Amino acid sequence: MNKTNPTIALVAGEVSGDILGAGLIRQLKAHYPNARFIGIAGPRMLAEGCETLVDMEELSVMGLAEILKHLPRLLKIRKNVIQTMLQEKPDVYIGIDAPDFNLDVELKLKANGIKTIHYVSPSVWAWRQNRIHKIAKATHQVLAFLPFEKAFYDKFNVPCRFIGHTMADAIPLKPNRAEACQTLQIDPAQRYLAILVGSRGSEVEFLAEPFLKTALLLKEQFPDLQFLVPLVNEKRRIQFETIKAKITPNLDLHLIDGNARQAMIAADATLLASGTAALEAMLCKSPMVVGYRMKPLTYFLAKRLVKTDYISLPNLLANEMLVPEMIQEECTPELLAEKLSVYLSDDESAVKNRHVLIQHFTDLHQKIQCNADKQAAQAVIDLLEGKENV
């Protein structure tokens, strides 16, 4: 490797990966001002000077049906990436998330003497744990957001570095509620529940009804309670409004385009689907209840495949049931309302418990707030310069 101008390959497959890639490139440029960046980039990575082989959107497909439909094109892109990398011989290849695409590329490149890093651990600790052997063969190192992920890799002696979570860096330890209310143009003197029905069509389909009925029950118990409903895009908004018109036509809601983070900061509590949103709610210091429903067959399979005691990231991080998880048959309006009312009550013990929970959230936030972009860049530098022991 040329010490001052390495060629660094990065491949991102969706918006979250583009954000991570751009942050990583920025930090690497500070160390290697003359480095060349190539791969598959989104607009943010392109703005940082990364050359792209194809538009990142080409990789952004979700769901089995969509993947099968686009499979010939995806395989062609993967073949093109492998051929290009074998010709260019970058000093390191960094696959950013997108494991179904990147791990096969990494496997081929590592076998041909190219250093590889996988940035963002697949949920191998939760299900399909045998993937760990492929990851070990494909990568020189995995960069993990969460400490329990590194602990899992350590059990299998697979090189992994915990770098902290970029979201924990982006959200302050003490979020500003007044500012969030101002951004949303809502009255800070009011009491609010944030309702996040998920970003996927299937999540909205399964969760909108129980979540809306929960809101009705809570409105009876707390007549002054108002509801903030951030929706990720126009498609999900139309889908949600259609369900609402049938289920709770007279319920007043503040529908918000995006801005989920501000809604959670402004709210007294949050009702949400599992996933990254639960981690974000924790970082926003919003007491939450996690609700999730899926097709019976999907649930039957998931119960047998998933190897963890909890499904939400706050509970996985704490290794205890910090926030209620109401899954499948437990995800009923009555049970959700019962759990949420504890957070919304003015009762002295409820207020005390709320403070204790928020302190737990703050402690967990501090554990994963490590300047992840910088840590990721340092891991790349250490691998390039032969100091990769962790």
Swiss-Prot record:
GO molecular function: lipid-A-disaccharide synthase activity; phospholipid binding
Entry keyword set: Glycosyltransferase, Lipid A biosynthesis, Lipid biosynthesis, Lipid metabolism, Transferase
Enzyme class (EC, first level): transferase
Pathway it works in: Bacterial outer membrane biogenesis; LPS lipid A biosynthesis
Top-rank taxon: Bacteria
Pfam entry (one): LpxB
InterPro entries for the chain: Glyco_trans_19
GO CC annotations, alphabetized: membrane
Biological process according to GO: lipid A biosynthetic process
Catalyzed reaction equations: a lipid X + a UDP-2-N,3-O-bis[(3R)-3-hydroxyacyl]-alpha-D-glucosamine = a lipid A disaccharide + UDP + H(+)
Its EC number(s): 2.4.1.182
NCBIfam families, per the entry: lpxB
Family label: Belongs to the LpxB family.
HAMAP family: LpxB (MF_00392)
Role of this protein: Condensation of UDP-2,3-diacylglucosamine and 2,3-diacylglucosamine-1-phosphate to form lipid A disaccharide, a precursor of lipid A, a phosphorylated glycolipid that anchors the lipopolysaccharide to the outer membrane of the cell.
Protein's recorded name: Lipid-A-disaccharide synthase
